[in-house]
Amino acid sequence: MKKLILSLLCSIALNVQAQERIILLNEGNWQSDNGKISYFEDGKIVSNQWFRDANKRKLGDTPNDIIQINEDLIAITINWSNIIQFISPDGKRVAETEDVPNNRKLATDGRYVYVSSYGHECGTINGYEMFTKGYVAKIDIHTFEVVATCEVGYEPEGIAYYKGHLFVANTGGYAFQEDHEYETTVSIIDAETMQLVRDVDTG
């Protein structure tokens, strides 16, 4: 049984038949298109360009987060390239979506992937939706399409799934250049309906 550990360093570790495998996401330099994935087995580095080796192409510009959805699928947000890349555990591309621009962090319930976004638009199965603030997109892992969205606060970052709800940290990170204040709220979303339950002010 594969086990997943997600660390603050945006790495995932899998224990498969006593072999430790670590996949480490490297953001690279902003606007330099040099993001990459490093791959380790049993504490030894196998490749510092794991995605490129497997797919003969670059990963993209400023990858931001990585999560294992199930035993067959891993998702990566690539912020400045405006791509969510889906790969298999051997590093090969499965699918990608460009429907969630300025994507940030990831959460999953094993059936869907939930992505926070600083953006103000999103491509969904029902057409394009526009937002005043940031939002969370719900992606079907079988079709890789956005099936629902929920507007939250400005510039949402961290997102977690727990017992049917999503908890989203709003930052207001663009307050220095846009006409709004910094945020101190956490938005709670019903993951099934993608309806906002309430905002909690953390002070």
Label each residue range with its predicted role.
Residues 18-203:
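Predominantly soluble domains enriched in secretory-pathway, periplasmic, or organellar proteins
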Residues 1-4, 18:
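Positively charged n-region of N-terminal signal peptides that target proteins for export
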Residues 4-13:
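Sec-dependent N-terminal signal peptides
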